[in-house]
Amino acid sequence: MSLTKEQILEAVAKMSILDITELISMMEQKFGVSSINTIVPTSSPAETVEEKTEFDVVLTNIGANKIAVIKAVRGVISLGLKEAKDLVESAPITLKESISKDEAAALKKILEDAGASVEIK
């Protein structure tokens, strides 16, 4: 009578860690293999993450104080009243693209102080 793979797996699952370690050692000797050589790294150690240097400022919602948001947009983008109003009313919209992190943060603060919801992407 031979054991199935499932029966072997159940038997191993019931073993202690010490017994499993001994079993692995015995299998390595019997079959002439090493479990150390079979370990495959899951990610490359030389992986580097590039820091983003250009950001887009997106007006997502104008909030309750529409007039203050229009004034803030006019001030930071140098638009006329009608153009700023049309731009604000078409939210969500990208106000500025490819700007520095500091400039994006400053623009976000100005617009949020006026009552708008802003995202930096």
From Swiss-Prot:
Q: Which Pfam families match?
A: Ribosomal_L12, Ribosomal_L12_N
* BP term (GO), one: translation
Q: Which GO terms describe its molecular function?
A: mRNA binding; structural constituent of ribosome
Sorted alphabetically, which InterPro entries does this protein's record hold? Answer: Ribosomal_bL12, Ribosomal_bL12_C, Ribosomal_bL12_C/ClpS-like, Ribosomal_bL12_oligo, Ribosomal_bL12_oligo_N_sf
Quaternary arrangement and interactors, per the entry?
Homodimer. Part of the ribosomal stalk of the 50S ribosomal subunit. Forms a multimeric L10(L12)X complex, where L10 forms an elongated spine to which 2 to 4 L12 dimers bind in a sequential fashion. Binds GTP-bound translation factors.
Q: Which family does it belong to?
A: Belongs to the bacterial ribosomal protein bL12 family.
Q: What is this protein called?
A: Large ribosomal subunit protein bL12
Which species does the entry assign this protein to? Baumannia cicadellinicola subsp. Homalodisca coagulata
Kindly list the organism's lineage: Bacteria, Pseudomonadati, Pseudomonadota, Gammaproteobacteria, Candidatus Palibaumannia
